[in-house]
């Protein structure tokens, strides 16, 4: 609207409609200045309101897309979310997961603001590469690399790793082709799981842009759990904890996690301001560590396929649901 073409009387009428006061009736320039200022304020307010509505819409849309883990991970919780989902806070600022692993709850929740971390550098390179929009490079590698025993051991033992992309490519290939998706390293830090003998492997998730969208808006770190507790200690944040279980096996090849680490984690869990939800295997030691924080437990039955094709005996365990809020 060009105010200069209006008469003083018309401008005064506009001022009255907009409830503008403090002008001189005979000073046309003063009235025009006031009207322009009000218009600018109104436009800024409208832009802000549109932005806020858009942000709320994005969050709602994001949370309706439940993704599945990209890779297999020992102890993954994809089939168990139904047992503890109702304990998750309805509102929080940042989703935190310091033992991301396969990230079952993270991908399922599809949070708008998240920080995920793990001390496993190959895993972090994989998530980072996908978040950077380079999943097509991993897809090409999968297409060009045969799923056979000779190639598997060549990739596992001889592939030259000189950057995060080649690291991610090898890691993803191994996760898809190794026996039972297991993760184990020898004393020299070399991956030592045998070939899986799968007739077909599915890597189409790499073409799903929803993974890239989620990971691109996530801060992806290769840090210890202590670092996450220390740097995101806010009561408005939510942390999901799926740590290594309390067992005789404590050396994962890429990290050590025994009784000492479990005790350190429990101490941080009890002292932090962060709303923490943990799911972990039930043992006497864990029960004692978290005796005042256990809110639920459920049964989990495992049955593993053996390397010769036979199916092993069913293993019955219990998982504890623990929270500090």
Model feature map: region roles:
Residues 1-53:
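Basic helix-extension-helix modules of the SAP/HeH family
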Residues 10-15, 63-103:
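Short, Lys/Arg-rich amphipathic segments at extreme N-termini
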Residues 58-80, 86, 131-240, 244-250, ...:
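SAM-dependent nucleic-acid methyltransferase catalytic core
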Residues 86, 93-157:
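SAM cofactor-binding core of SAM-dependent methyltransferases
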Residues 91-94, 112-113, 215-219, 270-276:
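Short active-site oxyanion
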Residues 99-104, 206-207, 280-284:
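Short, polar loop motifs at secondary-structure junctions
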Residues 106-111, 212, 231-234, 286-292:
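Short loop/helix-cap segments at secondary-structure boundaries that form the rim of catalytic
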Residues 258-325:
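Long, positively charged, glycine-interspersed low-complexity recognition regions
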